[in-house]
């Protein structure tokens, strides 16, 4: 995984965890959890691509990996919409910057996962 992507994930997760958005803190915790899950999935997919012939072990481990891939894209779309919504309603510049960076990171990760998945097909 690109070291910049790792540091971006860590930075955004740390900053999001420090935010206090009032009644929506539960929503924010859910977003943080999904970001972490997405990072782990992206890492595992990237490692699978790095190992030649790993498609077979990936299929053996999870016969429905294409379905799982589709679910991850749904999660990414949901997170993008949630981050866009938070960006629209927040007036705090620190939060706006964090959400803009989170949005950019989601687009990058979506593209990376697409690239990895095409390499595995």
From Swiss-Prot:
Name of the featured protein: Nuclear export protein
Organism: Influenza A virus (strain A/India/6263/1980 H1N1)
SUPFAM superfamilies: Nonstructural protein ns2, Nep, M1-binding domain
Family that this chain belongs to: Belongs to the influenza viruses NEP family.
Residue interval(s) of motif Nuclear export signal: 12-21, 85-94
Listed InterPro entries: Flu_NS2 (IPR000968)
Top-rank lineage group of the source organism: Viruses
Function: Mediates the nuclear export of encapsidated genomic RNAs (ribonucleoproteins, RNPs). Acts as an adapter between viral RNPs complexes and the nuclear export machinery of the cell. Possesses no intrinsic RNA-binding activity, but includes a C-terminal M1-binding domain. This domain is believed to allow recognition of RNPs bound to the protein M1.
Swiss-Prot/TrEMBL keywords: Host nucleus, Host-virus interaction, Transport, Virion
Alphabetized Gene3D superfamilies for the sequence: 1.10.287.230, S15/NS1, RNA-binding
């Amino acid at each position: 995984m690109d070291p910049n992507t790792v540091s971006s994930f860590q930075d955004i997760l740390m900053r999001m965890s420090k935010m206090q958005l009032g009644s929506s803190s539960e929503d924010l915790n859910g977003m943080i959890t999904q970001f972490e899950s997405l990072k782990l999935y992206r890492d595992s997919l990237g490692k699978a691509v790095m190992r030649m012939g790993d498609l077979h072990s990936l299929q053996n481990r999870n016969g429905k990996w294409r379905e799982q891939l589709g679910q991850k894209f749904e999660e990414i779309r949901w997170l993008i919409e949630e981050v866009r919504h938070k960006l629209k309603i927040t007036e705090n510049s620190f939060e706006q910057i964090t959400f803009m960076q989170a949005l950019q990171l989601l687009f990058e990760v979506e593209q990376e996962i697409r690239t990895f998945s095409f390499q595995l097909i």
